[in-house]
Curated annotation (Swiss-Prot):
Belongs to the AccD/PCCB family. Keywords: ATP-binding, Cytoplasm, Fatty acid biosynthesis, Fatty acid metabolism, Lipid biosynthesis, Lipid metabolism, Nucleotide-binding, Transferase. Its EC number is 2.1.3.15. Acetyl-CoA carboxylase is a heterohexamer composed of biotin carboxyl carrier protein (AccB), biotin carboxylase (AccC) and two subunits each of ACCase subunit alpha (AccA) and ACCase subunit beta (AccD). The keyword Nucleus does not apply. One of its GO terms (biological process) is malonyl-CoA biosynthetic process. It comes from the Bacteria. The keyword Zinc does not apply. It catalyses: N(6)-carboxybiotinyl-L-lysyl-[protein] + acetyl-CoA = N(6)-biotinyl-L-lysyl-[protein] + malonyl-CoA. This is Acetyl-coenzyme A carboxylase carboxyl transferase subunit beta. Residues 24-293 form the CoA carboxyltransferase N-terminal domain.
Length: 319
């Protein structure tokens, strides 16, 4: 009997055992509730019930914004992967390699060109899963390139910010992206095109000292953490207890730091409405057939799927 119990039964269990995916369930960070992953995915990564906004990948974010989930990937300039030959506990090049394998992205920012309710827009998305969405040379070049394309196409530029700050492994070369992106935003302003920022959870550090807080319209997702320094650092500096909800989206809206807090389900129509107001474009008529995908800068034909847009654009601000 012991042989049947201790040997045969476990072997049968192993043969019949069904493998369970690691991401089958998601635990809500707010309530601790376990939710089926597919339910969260189909709900734009908003936890049903608690309405907690989970992080979205760059591709999922772009799909949620562009018409027909179709856009052109904007070709981005190549940069030196490890200019300082930086190493801490691990080599910087190894960290980049792991982040690329994990996310499928070249760096923390992805830029797409497409249509939002019929109007052409350029959208840049920071992916927090790529080294905390940190801002390095590649990410800075991506933001600048997206702004240049918006100037060239004379259309709005929308950026979804999600970052822990500057990338320390690139030192001052990372910090240089703060003034470079600021100058590029000014180029868009001089072209009289809208610049819209959507602050997601979290948006902290150096990006809040540059392009993430320069929008003509500042929008945030509910509950997003937004700030330059951490709450504990501020409390230790001023030696005072911070109020409840400090650095959260709702607190910043109530104190005039941002314009709107918009639920993710309402984000696409809100962005389309803001773009129409700022560009004085007519509203798309619902009875019209589905809008076609945008024509890339140098190709008159319609795309069948996501493609790369040619990189021709004005010169970037000097490094």
């Amino acid at each position: 009997m012991n042989w049947l119990t201790n040997v045969v039964r476990p072997k049968i269990r192993n043969i019949l055992k069904r493998e369970t995916p690691d991401n089958l369930w998601i635990k809500c960070p707010d309530t601790g509730q376990l939710v089926f992953y597919k339910d969260v995915e189909s709900n734009q990564f908003v936890i049903p019930g608690s309405n907690y906004h989970m992080r979205m990948s760059a591709d999922a974010r772009l799909k949620s914004i562009f018409d027909n989930e179709t856009w052109y990937d904007v070709a981005l300039p190549e940069v030196t992967a490890d200019p300082l030959k930086f190493r801490d506990e691990r080599k910087y090049v190894d960290r980049i390699r792991d982040a690329r394998a994990k996310t499928g992205l070249h760096d923390s920012v992805k830029v797409g060109f497409g249509r939002l309710e019929g109007s052409a827009v350029v959208v840049a998305v920071q992916d927090f899963d790529f080294m905390g969405g940190s801002l390095g040379m590649a990410a800075g070049e991506a933001i600048v390139r997206g702004l240049e394309l918006a100037v060239e196409k004379r259309c709005p530029f929308i950026v979804f910010a999600a970052s822990g700050g500057a990338r320390m492994q690139e030192g001052v070369l990372s910090l240089m992206q703060l003034p470079r992106t600021t100058v590029a935003v000014q180029m868009l302003r001089e072209a009289r095109q809208p610049y819209i920022v959507v602050l997601t959870n979290p948006t902290t550090g150096g990006v809040t000292a540059s392009y993430a807080m320069l929008g003509d319209v500042q929008i945030a997702e509910p509950g997003a953490l937004i700030g330059f320094a951490g709450a504990r650092v501020i409390e230790q500096t001023i030696r005072e207890k911070l109020p409840d909800g400090f650095q959260r989206a709702e607190y910043l809206r109530d104190h005039g730091m941002i314009d709107l807090v918009v639920h993710r389900h309402e984000l696409r129509p809100t962005l389309a409405r803001v773009c129409r107001l700022l560009t004085k474009a007519p509203e798309m008529i619902e009875q019209e057939p589905e809008p076609s995908a945008p024509v890339p800068p140098d190709e008159p034909d319609e795309p069948a799927a996501t493609q790369e847009a040619p990189p021709a654009a004005p010169a970037a601000p000097p490094a």
